[in-house]
Amino acid sequence: MKKILVLHGPNLNLLGSREPSIYGHASLTQINGDLIQEADNAGIRLSCFQSNAEAELIQAVHQAGIDKINYIIINPAAFTHTSIALRDALSAVAIPFIEVHLSNIFSRETFRHHSYFSDIAVGVISGLGTKGYLLALQAIIKELK
């Protein structure tokens, strides 16, 4: 069975209550549930992990390599603009990944315009809200079939 890992970065545990005008009203639990359902329907095992700690996300990426995860969907959140270490972990395991952002990072503060991940990602989806996760998953399902 093919396996996908969804990684959520810092503060995404607050989705649904954190700045809903930017991030929407869906909770992380709702987003994960929708993704798991979609993957189950396609016969793919999907697991989700959220952490506010960079080291825990790096360890999850390392474990994904050991677990032979086929694909990663990652919303690095604020680590998008700061974490060379998380980027290096993704490069080290060589698992293809899609970078997802709920908001359009290019329409926000200038410090959010740079991503340490985009140039090594298979693709980037930004600004489509929670649909971005689903679109990433649908693209991966088509690729894995």
UniProtKB/Swiss-Prot annotation:
Keywords: Amino-acid biosynthesis, Aromatic amino acid biosynthesis, Lyase. Its EC number is 4.2.1.10. NCBIfam families: aroQ, PRK05395.1-1, PRK05395.1-2, PRK05395.1-3, PRK05395.1-4. InterPro entries: DHquinase_II, DHquinase_II_CS, DHquinase_II_sf. It catalyses: 3-dehydroquinate = 3-dehydroshikimate + H2O. The record marks R18 as: Transition state stabilizer. Substrate binds at N75, H81, D88, L102, S103, R112. The lineage of its organism: Bacteria, Pseudomonadati, Pseudomonadota, Gammaproteobacteria, Legionellales. It comes from Legionella pneumophila subsp. pneumophila (strain Philadelphia 1 / ATCC 33152 / DSM 7513). This is 3-dehydroquinate dehydratase. Homododecamer. It is an enzyme of class 4 (lyase). Coiled coil: none annotated. The active site is at Y23 (proton acceptor), H101 (proton donor). Catalyzes a trans-dehydration via an enolate intermediate. Belongs to the type-II 3-dehydroquinase family. Pathway: Metabolic intermediate biosynthesis; chorismate biosynthesis; chorismate from D-erythrose 4-phosphate and phosphoenolpyruvate: step 3/7. One of its GO terms (molecular function) is 3-dehydroquinate dehydratase activity. GO terms for biological process: amino acid biosynthetic process; aromatic amino acid family biosynthetic process; chorismate biosynthetic process; quinate catabolic process. It holds the Pfam family DHquinase_II.
